[in-house]
Swiss-Prot record:
InterPro entries: RPB5-like_sf. This is Uncharacterized protein 028R. It comes from the Viruses.
Amino acid sequence: MDPNVLKNLSLMLSRRAGVSGGEPPRMIEWPEYGQRSEPCGSQTVWYVDRPVGAPFIKAFASEVEERGGGILIHAGKVTFDSAKKLAAMKEVQVFDVKYFSFDLMAVVPEHSLWKRPGDKGYPEKTAQSFPKIMASDPVCRYHGFRPRDLVHVKPHDVYIVC
């Protein structure tokens, strides 16, 4: 894995955890597919440098069952059927390697979670009146924001993720 990708991945993981800096995950060889992180944290990171097709999906489904959720970073092509199956795996976030070629947070305004549905003070009746930001937005995916979360974009306004 490219050291720059690993550095930016560790920045993302540390920002999600709310700490500064942070150690990059130790990547070990994942035979036939690429690399994966050692099972020390709560999330596994998989890096695939080959095309993602049906044989990969079969192996990956059993891997997710065994290790739980995590992040899949792919550097090769993904077939349409594989993309649909990966999207159906709710416990896995899928990123193209290009998202980690630079530090995304250095080029966009600061985003922070304000309230989640069910939190005390969440404005159920007026939440839909906030400006909208898509859950597929790279920054929302980067931070792990979910639909209906209220996100504060500094210095601007509060947005609802839809």
